[in-house]
């Protein structure tokens, strides 16, 4: 009986100390600068037009000529041919822990790095996108991301998708290992990697499937693509992000500003053919944000988004609830505590609303 009492005391002390330790950690852990209190701003329409580069663009043609991309032997298996193109990029540059060049196309990236020949994952994905474009395929970059805020952990990785005439769908290619994914023996698109359970996916590449997924356990939470996938990106600087949970909505990521982002739960936006013409119209407007790069100021540039582009004229509501007419963009400087932003097309009916807590 004495031993039982001693054991109970030990268990109680352990539980108390464990709870105290977690409470202390919770107090000292850095809080998120911004907390999303409300996001009544999820886009589930179908009126976004995406833009892709033509294979006859001068910089694409330069890549093809300099690196003899048109000499890569065609394969009966389309995916094998694409993987040979990915391999060709890996013979010209190597992936390393370096900063992005900030260039928007593969030709400029390779020119900027000179003899270094080492590029970031983002730059590598741009180069591979343009190499695939040179072969006559529509291609785009995808970013898979996860923010485990409770553990202060951020993780992301890039893939490249090309549109397959054989399968009539987007097919995701891993840029590091040179592999691809399947579900029920059909190649997967980028959004499928996030939409489906990892246990349903197969990976075919140089790594074993087990090794490949071992360091990506908590990664598949959101998927982002550019609206404008051309070499100049002059038609749009916005991205669209498919989320599995509203927990994945963020204004910044790993202390970096995000590009103006439209969040959606509609996977159909990511699966449509590049040849499909835009016919739908949105029935309301949405809020799109971009953090100002000015240091020491918590300021955001805000726009109204409808029918795939920024609205030239609309109404914005702030904390007092009244609407004010604005043109294209306006700036919001956050105050400590709760910040509300809403927009309206007519100045009467609210279309979208977000509430942000600034700590």
Segments (PLM) and residue ranges:
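N-terminal Sec-pathway targeting helices
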Residues: 1-17, 23
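Aromatic/pi-system hotspot detector in well-structured domains
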Residues: 88, 163, 314-315
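His-Asp-centered catalytic microenvironments across diverse enzyme cores
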Residues: 167-290
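Membrane-interface motif at the C-terminal end of an N-terminal transmembrane signal
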Residues: 18-35
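Low-complexity, disordered linker/stalk regions enriched in Pro/Thr/Ser/Gly
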Residues: 238-359
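Hydrophobic/aromatic-rich core segments of domains that either
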Residues: 126-202
